[in-house]
């Protein structure tokens, strides 16, 4: 006999507080009813619950209509003033009763609907009999005193996931989990339909690019001395930004660092010490005294990025002195131009930022890898999209980082006053796509991992000036990821 569990829980897997559901989500209630009443055979399904769960249901809704209501209570003298279909003192008694009434229940689905003790008991003692988990993830920190057990990803895998929904200032989405084949339980039944499993198609494209480089990459020397395997101009990759944010799930991403680096560029800054003060060290290796001297930049102070990303974004063609100097209106402000075009000339095909200046790359500690953004305003859908070009992409360490940089740029622009747009998509185009030799084994491990659904990014405050955004203005919701255990050293 098989049965399903259905549950809604918040950030800490909390499911209830003082015998009540601590949120009001009408969409989730409709979802619960739809799942637990659906039966293609025209029969009523069975919902099994503990006594506390039964009593938490408002009296006007008891019993749950169009379903057989089975209530589990250890109190033999439990008397219910409302009609239940069966009261049992143990879960096994209920299952035996159902088995004894196959003429009545043979086509009924069985749903375990709570609470905490029953969920734990079934997952511990009847794991072999569980078919699916229907989970509503609510992305909110709510005080709870009852909790759902942690889902073991070695036993269960995601079968389906919905888009994000929002109600009463809470974001949530629906998951369906199924048991894996060859899991550690004694059940050898194949419950899964491998032709219809959840796939993160966008991250699959990223994995396929890595596989292409591993299988077909040309071995090349490079400036760092580490060496790479490389392909040129792999297929472009597109990520939809309307519902999710493309932060890598194969290893944990560092969104705060992506944000602070982008804001450094947006503010026209080139001083790595600003990042170091925020405990972000991605530029340390490329701004040491030794590295700058090797680049012929002995006149720049240690920590100076030189005439690259930030300077070229806000002062293109200007005269660069060092990271401590104030530049005012020196050079051309590409970001100011782009914002003005988005607001006042949205059909323009010239809404570009180019961070590559051939004349001055010799003055950069590291010439821009992500060096071009082209923005596109869809005036019908009211969306903003971007295409980014990477002349060079460290695919294991930096490719997803750069994708997230471009995506985050779109989100910030959409949340400026007087720009009434929402994020559309981002397309990544790449020149030299490579994996450093010291990352090859890590990349092989990463591409074998299963992807999770992407999270959602929410910008909570509008700003008059893009320079005024701070990290506390953004929130990442529903980020599931593998641990950050694949730590590759950056080649310098």
Give the residues covered by each predicted segment.
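Eukaryotic N-terminal low-complexity, Ser/Thr- and Lys/Arg-rich leader segments
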Residues: 1-2, 103, 181-201
């Amino acid at each position: 006999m098989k049965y399903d569990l259905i549950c809604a829980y918040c950030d800490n897997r909390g499911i209830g507080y003082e015998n009540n559901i601590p949120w009001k989500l009408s969409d989730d209630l409709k979802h619960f009813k739809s799942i637990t009443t659906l039966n293609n055979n025209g029969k009523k399904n069975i919902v099994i619950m503990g006594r506390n769960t039964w009593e938490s249901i408002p009296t006007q809704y008891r019993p749950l209509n169009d379903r057989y209501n089975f209530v589990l209570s250890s109190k033999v003298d439990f008397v219910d003033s409302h009609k239940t279909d069966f009261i049992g003192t143990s879960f096994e008694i209920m299952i035996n009763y159902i088995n004894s009434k196959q003429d009545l229940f043979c086509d009924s689905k069985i749903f375990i609907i709570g609470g905490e003790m029953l969920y734990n008991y079934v997952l511990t003692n009847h794991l072999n009999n569980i078919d699916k988990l229907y989970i509503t993830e609510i992305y909110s920190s709510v005080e709870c005193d009852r909790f759902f057990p942690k889902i073991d990803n070695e036993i269960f895998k995601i079968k389906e996931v919905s888009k994000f929904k929002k109600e009463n200032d809470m974001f949530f989405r629906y998951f369906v989990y199924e048991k894996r084949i060859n899991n550690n339980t004694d059940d050898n039944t194949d419950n899964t339909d491998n032709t219809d499993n959840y796939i993160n198609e966008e991250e699959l494209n990223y994995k396929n690019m890595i596989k292409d480089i591993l299988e077909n990459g040309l071995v090349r020397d490079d400036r760092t001395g580490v060496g790479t395997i490389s392909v040129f101009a792999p297929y472009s990759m597109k990520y939809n930004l309307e519902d999710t944010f493309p932060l890598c799930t194969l290893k944990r991403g560092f969104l705060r660092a992506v944000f602070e680096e982008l804001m450094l560029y947006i503010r026209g800054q080139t001083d790595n010490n600003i990042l170091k003060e925020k405990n972000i060290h991605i530029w340390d290796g490329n701004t040491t005294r030794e590295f700058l001297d090797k680049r012929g930049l002995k006149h720049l102070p240690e920590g100076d990025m030189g005439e690259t990303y930030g300077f070229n974004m806000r002062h293109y063609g200007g005269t660069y002195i060092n990271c401590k100097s104030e530049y005012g209106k020196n050079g051309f402000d590409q970001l100011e131009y782009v914002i003005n075009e988005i607001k006042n000339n949205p059909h323009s095909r010239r809404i570009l930022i180019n961070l590559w200046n051939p004349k001055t790359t010799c003055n950069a500690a590291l010439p821009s890898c992500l060096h071009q953004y082209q923005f596109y305003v869809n005036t019908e859908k009211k969306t903003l999209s971007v295409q980014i070009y990477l002349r060079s992409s460290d695919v294991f360490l930096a490719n997803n980082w750069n994708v997230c940089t471009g995506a985050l740029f779109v989100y910030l622009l959409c949340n400026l006053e007087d720009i009434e747009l929402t994020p559309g998509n981002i397309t990544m185009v790449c020149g030299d796509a490579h994996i450093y030799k010291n990352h090859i084994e890590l990349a092989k491990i990463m591409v074998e991992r299963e992807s999770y659904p992407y999270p959602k990014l929410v910008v909570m405050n509008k700003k008059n000036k893009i320079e005024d955004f701070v990290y506390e203005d953004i929130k990442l919701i529903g980020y599931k990821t593998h641990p950050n255990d694949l730590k590759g050293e950056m080649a310098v």
